[in-house]
Structure formats: structure tokens, C-alpha cells
From Swiss-Prot:
<keyword id="KW-0560">Oxidoreductase</keyword>
<dbReference type="GO" id="GO:0009086">
    <property type="term" value="P:methionine biosynthetic process"/>
</dbReference>
<dbReference type="InterPro" id="IPR036291">
    <property type="entry name" value="NAD(P)-bd_dom_sf"/>
</dbReference>
<dbReference type="GO" id="GO:0004488">
    <property type="term" value="F:methylenetetrahydrofolate dehydrogenase (NADP+) activity"/>
</dbReference>
<keyword id="KW-0486">Methionine biosynthesis</keyword>
<comment type="subunit">
    <text>Homodimer.</text>
</comment>
<protein>
    <recommendedName>
        <fullName>Bifunctional protein FolD</fullName>
        <ecNumber>1.5.1.5</ecNumber>
        <ecNumber>3.5.4.9</ecNumber>
    </recommendedName>
</protein>
<keyword id="KW-0521">NADP</keyword>
<dbReference type="GO" id="GO:0000105">
    <property type="term" value="P:L-histidine biosynthetic process"/>
</dbReference>
<feature type="binding site">
    <location>
        <begin position="164"/>
        <end position="166"/>
    </location>
    <ligand>
        <name>NADP(+)</name>
    </ligand>
</feature>
<dbReference type="GO" id="GO:0035999">
    <property type="term" value="P:tetrahydrofolate interconversion"/>
</dbReference>
<dbReference type="InterPro" id="IPR046346">
    <property type="entry name" value="Aminoacid_DH-like_N_sf"/>
</dbReference>
<comment type="function">
    <text>Catalyzes the oxidation of 5,10-methylenetetrahydrofolate to 5,10-methenyltetrahydrofolate and then the hydrolysis of 5,10-methenyltetrahydrofolate to 10-formyltetrahydrofolate.</text>
</comment>
<comment type="pathway">
    <text>One-carbon metabolism; tetrahydrofolate interconversion.</text>
</comment>
<comment type="similarity">
    <text>Belongs to the tetrahydrofolate dehydrogenase/cyclohydrolase family.</text>
</comment>
<dbReference type="InterPro" id="IPR020631">
    <property type="entry name" value="THF_DH/CycHdrlase_NAD-bd_dom"/>
</dbReference>
<dbReference type="InterPro" id="IPR020630">
    <property type="entry name" value="THF_DH/CycHdrlase_cat_dom"/>
</dbReference>
Length: 286
């Protein structure tokens, strides 16, 4: 069984980006800039934002965090986004979700300039993904695809099953897996709460992707011998973080598997950095 170490892979990507930023900054005359907006006091969101800030600092990206009160209004939030859209030193804007009740997250995401939408959630970027056109890809599924490529695990011509259909992971991941390319080109099935026999569908997968937010839900008897299992789930339990699969059991039948934590999570942040650097290069004409 091969452990797909997202933490180590993400560290390698940060090293590559650090070298690229150092080489290009003299021509750009500034470092890449990322604005992170956090509204409210959700503990998990605060941890995620700190991790992103740390990764930016480690890579050479200037990270500017805007920590707003939970009483922030829709108008105030959209005004901040509008200001960041026109700031020349900001290459990417990330709105940390979820937002407090009363705020319309979709409206806020649509207010972000698509050219600075490094999270890849603007309808324009999602539409470009669906059409196979260049654009920012959502960070978690793009990080998953990068992890497969770095480990030379190609789903091309194979059966891929995605469990979960969220706009953040399931839908875009299915589109990426089914797109042309050496590390894509899979035959994709998307499963969800309406799937009659989920276990049977999972057992057909050469590549199984889990993104349902249910701790240890997928067990070894639901996984084909030799399958590659990518667990996107991050669930807080009484005993700590757990993925969507029973790692101990599934790792005995899988040929490769991501751990939780240390699998997809670090790759999500790495992809955010990649997107930010890409925006910086375009905006600076590099």
C-alpha cells in the first residue's frame, strides 16, 4: 500500500514556488499579494486562515488578512471586496467560508473579480472549467489532481467514482477527472444521497474519491482490491480528525490512499498558492 503524502508533496510545491517567486520578483517589482477575508469567529475557519497565512509567509507571498466582526453587513463585505478588486498589489482574493448567518456567500463570491478568484468559485471560472477553458480551478479538487500527477497515478481509461456532489469538491472534481489529459480522461460516476446502492458503486472504482463529510463512512468491504482511494473528508470527532473512510480497514485493500490529516488538506493550500502565483505572473506580465 502506497501512502499519498500530501504534506510532503505540498512542501515540495512550496519550495518550487519560493524559488520561482525569488527569481521573478525583480522583474515584477513586487511580491505576489493575497487578501484573505474572514468574517466572524468560527474556530475551524480561524485555524484554516492561520495555516494559509503561514504557507504564504513560507513561500514569499504577501498575505493580508481582513478579520471582520460577525455583525458585518452584506454591503460592508461587498464594499471591501470591491476595494480589493481594484488594488494593484492584490493578485488573489479568498473569502473564507462558511459566512455567518444573514450573509449571502454566493453574492459575495460573484462580487470577486474572476481574475483574482484564486479559490476558483466564481461562476465564470466554474463555467470555464465545465467548458474545458483556462481559468482558476477550485483548490481542493485541483490539489487532488496534482497529487495524483506527482505520484504518477493516472486514472486515464479507468473507472473513477466520486462520492459527493458539492460545488466545492464533488462537481469540479468530476469535471477534472473526465477532462482530456494523461492524468484525467477517466470514466466518471458521481454518487450522492440519492444513489440506491452506494457500496456497489464504490466497488466498481479503480479510483475512489470521498467527499461527503461523514467520518469513517466508507469501509473496506466497499472498496475494490487495489483501488486508489483519495479521502477528501476532514471530520472532527471525539478522538481527533477522521476522514470519510475507515483508514485502518481500507488501507489493507487499497493500493494507494491519502491519510487524514496530511493528505488532501495540505494540497488544497498548495493549490491556493499556485493559483495566486499564476495570477501574479499574468498581472505583472511575466
Amino acid at each position: 500500500m502506497q501512502l499519498l503524502d500530501g504534506k510532503a508533496t505540498a512542501a515540495t510545491i512550496r519550495e518550487e514556488l519560493r524559488a520561482e517567486i525569488a527569481a521573478l520578483t525583480p522583474r515584477a517589482r513586487r511580491a505576489p499579494g493575497l487578501a484573505v477575508i474572514l468574517v466572524g469567529e468560527d474556530p475551524a475557519s480561524q485555524v484554516y486562515v492561520r495555516n494559509k497565512e503561514r504557507a504564504c509567509h513560507d513561500t514569499g507571498i504577501v498575505s493580508e488578512a481582513f478579520r471582520l466582526a460577525p455583525t458585518t453587513t452584506q454591503e460592508e463585505l461587498e464594499r471591501l471586496i470591491a476595494d480589493l478588486n481594484v488594488r494593484p498589489d492584490i493578485d488573489g482574493i479568498l473569502l473564507q467560508l462558511p459566512l455567518p448567518r444573514g450573509l449571502d456567500a454566493q453574492r459575495c463570491l460573484e462580487a470577486i473579480d474572476p481574475a483574482k478568484d484564486v479559490d476558483g468559485f466564481h461562476p465564470q471560472n466554474m463555467g470555464r472549467l465545465a467548458l474545458g477553458l483556462p481559468g482558476f480551478r477550485p483548490c481542493t479538487p485541483a490539489g487532488v489532481m496534482t497529487l495524483l500527477e506527482r505520484y504518477d497515478l493516472s486514472p486515464s481509461g479507468r473507472k473513477a467514482v466520486v462520492v459527493g456532489r458539492s460545488n466545492i469538491v464533488g462537481k469540479p472534481l468530476a469535471l477534472m477527472l473526465g477532462a482530456p489529459g494523461k492524468y484525467a480522461n477517466a470514466t466518471v460516476t458521481v454518487c450522492h444521497s440519492g444513489t440506491p446502492d452506494l457500496a456497489a458503486e464504490c466497488r466498481t472504482a479503480d479510483f475512489l474519491f470521498l467527499a461527503i463529510g461523514r467520518p469513517r463512512f466508507v469501509t473496506a468491504d466497499m472498496v475494490r482490491e487495489g483501488a486508489v482511494v483519495v479521502d477528501v473528508g476532514i471530520n472532527r470527532t471525539e478522538t481527533g480528525l477522521a476522514g470519510d473512510c475507515d483508514f485502518e480497514g481500507v488501507s489493507r485493500v487499497a493500493s494507494a490512499i491519502t491519510p487524514v490529516p496530511g493528505g488532501v488538506g495540505p494540497m488544497t493550500i498548495a493549490q491556493l498558492l499556485v493559483n495566486t502565483v499564476q495570477s501574479w505572473k499574468v498581472r505583472c506580465g511575466l
